[in-house]
A protein has these predicted regions:
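N-terminal secretory signal peptides that target proteins for export/translocation
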Residues: 1-15
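Residue-level signal for mature regions of secreted extracellular proteins and peptides
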Residues: 26-27, 129
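C-terminal motif of bacterial Sec signal peptides marking the signal peptidase cleavage site
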Residues: 29-32
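Feature for extracytoplasmic/surface-facing segments of secreted or surface-associated proteins
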Residues: 34-312
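Flexible "stalk/tail and boundary" regions
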Residues: 269-679
Length: 679
């Protein structure tokens, strides 16, 4: 998976700030992705635990079971540890105080799980709520939390990739080698709600982010209709249960229902949307009579150069930080490499740049097993001092190494740390291997020449055996070149569709390549490493009558082999076409589209505010998406830019809890034969 070929970006406004945490600051003891967890020498014992209240909407819930839980670390969906147990008061306050407890080793992030209780209409066995607290040993008797449907929504979307939902209960757990991924999942959820107040964070309260406040409140109102009822058979609870039943397994409470909504946000949306009360407990919420396209929860990052320039390529490092290349505006400025942490904090205000070659047009990027971020940079006539180059950045933003490379586009790194870059000339494209010699990268290795005029994405198969280059020839037609690094042979594949706009690729665990084909076929094709067409999956959405054209950009495979495809919806000028949001389509490992037919369309849910451009008239958080990546928490990241906006409207988008976690960076998955596997 690499970034796809994109157009140049226009100028817009820049915003900047560092978001604040709403929970107590986490003091994390994190394991490296793909490494054994860090062990603590002794357990930590607290004499008194946190306190708080449990509510259904704004009503206290009395007699509810309150459990302090530590996620399991023996496998995904493994049994959590119950650290402390109590019940809420029945005096009309719904309050609780946890007794003392001993933190597990290694010290972990913990959460509250609520079951049953009386919200005012009698005992309701369908009550299930949750709240993420933070690091076990940093909690104390002064920690106070409000648990309600909003904290439940945030917890469900964070924990869904690690959850097992059965008729016997809910289990949250990860593997011993992905404690980092589970810990990181707490951070974006922490930005969605205030756990001390039990309210959703306002849409623009955290600078550099646009939060899905209206969507969080809408989901909370749907759950509250069941919580504040007489039980599972009630007219507002039974439909929630039936509409969130997955594979014949019905949820036993509202927490399980929320987990299922997080994992299947495009399922039964109209039926669920209509469950909220006409006088709902949480506002502001979506008030339109028309339900949203789906119930994805996403955060739009628009700080610093992102809002102005948009994003192009994207990669996730071992810590779970997202690295994004931002192009320069058409003013002769310099582009930048941006870093976004799981908590939403940014790197330096202007991003990371290099003084030697300059950075104008970033195209591709990839992260090597040692954590160096390699970026393809192209020169520009507006910056005559810049030169085409491959630039390696250390995680602190300093330059590790840099050297000239002619018009580099796609970038991938294999398991040994060698860089593979596609290159574009006027007559042909090529891709080459830039070797790692004891940490010093030199420009002196394999070059494979192809016949197409536009190089594109580069993808590497398991154990670095195969390297794929996608050449998007536009009107000349596309071709895919396979280079076997063992036999040193080259094979050219002409897509079965005859497509002329194939820009993205990803390789699965079996070594098959998945191609994003945005031509008239409009779908995904899968080829074996012998060049045989295995599958072709069409994606709905082309509408030539209205001028709506799907341009599939890139795709990524999650830890269960599901494919996520980013789609830029092209609004052909002059034909009266409406405003179209960007799209994210999900296919399962068998190729069936499991997202809505037109894909997920993440939104903040806020009312339209006017403006110009494809996205500015809407509250969409997915702006003409391009590059795509999945992190160790199961979040899907996309770069994007609003090409036609007259004010800043571009985002890097994080869709929460939608995918299965993957090994990061991708080069480590290649090295360890863990592509499309969970860590």
């Amino acid at each position: 998976m690499t970034s796809s070929l994109r157009h140049e970006l226009g100028p817009a406004r820049i915003t900047a700030a560092t978001p604040l945490l709403l929970l107590p600051v986490f003091s994390l003891a994190l394991a490296g992705c793909g490494a054994a967890p860090m062990e603590e020498p002794t357990a930590v014992t607290l004499t008194a635990g946190p306190s708080g209240v449990v509510r259904g909407g704004q009503q206290p819930i009395g007699g509810a079971l309150v459990q302090l839980m530590a996620p399991g670390i023996t496998g995904y969906g493994s049994a959590p540890s119950v650290l402390a147990t109590t019940s809420t008061s029945t005096d009309g306050a719904g309050s609780f105080t946890l007794p003392g407890y001993t933190c597990p080793t290694p010290d972990r992030l913990v959460y509250l799980q609520i079951s049953g209780g009386n919200p005012g209409s009698g005992t309701n066995s369908a009550v299930g709520e949750a709240a993420l607290l933070g690091n076990c040993s940093t909690l104390s008797s002064t920690t106070h939390v409000v648990v309600n449907e909003l904290t439940t929504v945030a917890a469900a979307y964070a924990l869904a990739p690690f959850a097992s939902v059965t008729s016997g209960g809910t289990a949250i757990g990860t593997s011993s080698t992905n404690v980092t991924g589970l810990n990181n999942a707490f951070y974006p959820a922490n930005n969605l709600v205030s756990y001390t107040l039990g309210v959703a964070t306002p849409t623009t309260a955290l600078s550099g982010m646009v939060l899905p406040t209206y969507m969080v409140n809408t989901l909370g109102n749907i759950l509250a209709a069941c919580v504040n009822s007489t039980g599972p058979a009630s007219t507002t609870c039974a439909p929630l249960i039936s509409n969130t039943t997955v594979s014949g397994v019905a949820p036993i409470d509202t927490f399980q229902a929320a987990l299922n909504m997080a994992l299947h946000p495009g399922t039964n949306v109209p039926g669920l949307f209509g469950l909220a009360s006409t006088s709902p407990p949480f506002a502001p919420a979506i008030t339109s009579l028309t339900p949203p396209a789906d119930f994805t929860l996403a955060i739009g990052y628009n700080g610093y150069t992102i809002s102005n320039e948009g994003g192009y390529a994207l990669g996730i490092d071992a810590k779970g930080d997202a690295w994004v290349t931002a192009n320069a505006p058409n003013t002769g400025g310099l582009g930048a490499l941006m870093e976004i942490t799981p908590s939403g904090q940014y790197s330096a205000a202007s991003g990371y740049q290099t003084p030697t070659y300059g950075v104008v047009s970033f195209t591709g990027m990839a992260i090597d097993p040692g954590g160096v971020i390699w970026v393809a940079s192209n020169s520009d006539s507006l910056q005559p001092t810049t030169t085409d180059a491959m630039i390696g950045f250390n995680p602190n933003g300093s330059v590790f190494n840099q050297f000239p490379v002619t018009f580099p586009l796609g970038v991938a790194v294999d398991g040994s740390g060698d860089i593979w870059s596609s290159n574009w000339t006027n007559m042909y494209s090529s891709f080459q291997e830039l070797q790692d010699q004891s940490g010093t990268y030199t420009n002196n290795a394999v070059t494979v020449t192809t016949t197409e005029s536009s190089g594109g994405a580069v993808c590497i198969g398991p154990m670095s055996r195969d390297v794929w280059e996608v050449a998007a020839g536009y009107n000349q037609g596309s071709a895919v070149t396979l280079y076997n690094t063992t036999a040193l042979t080259k094979t050219t594949i002409t897509p079965d569709s005859g497509g002329s706009y194939i820009t993205g690729c990803a390789v699965d665990h079996a070594g098959n390549v998945w191609l994003a084909d945005g031509t008239s076929f409009n779908g995904v094709e899968v080829y074996s490493n012998t060049g045989a067409l295995l599958h072709s999956y069409a994606i709905a959405g082309q509408n030539t009558a209205t001028g709506q054209f799907n341009l599939l950009q890139d795709l990524a495979l999650d830890g269960l082999g599901n494919a996520f495809v980013s789609i830029f919806v092209y609004d052909q000028s002059g034909n009266g076409a409406a405003t179209y949001p960007g799209r994210l389509v999900e296919l399962n490992s068998s190729g069936a589209v499991v997202s809505p037919a037109y894909g997920y369309q993440p939104t903040s849910g806020a009312p339209n505010t006017g403006g110009s451009g494809l996205q500015a008239l809407t509250s969409n958080l997915l702006t003409s998406p391009g590059g795509i990546g999945i992190d160790g928490s199961g979040n899907v990241w996309l770069t994007g830019v609003d090409y036609y906006a007259t004010s800043a409207a571009s985002f890097v988008t994080e869709v929460l809890g939608l995918a299965a976690p993957v090994v990061t960076p991708h080069s480590v998955a290649v090295k360890n034969n863990a592509i499309a596997n969970r860590p």
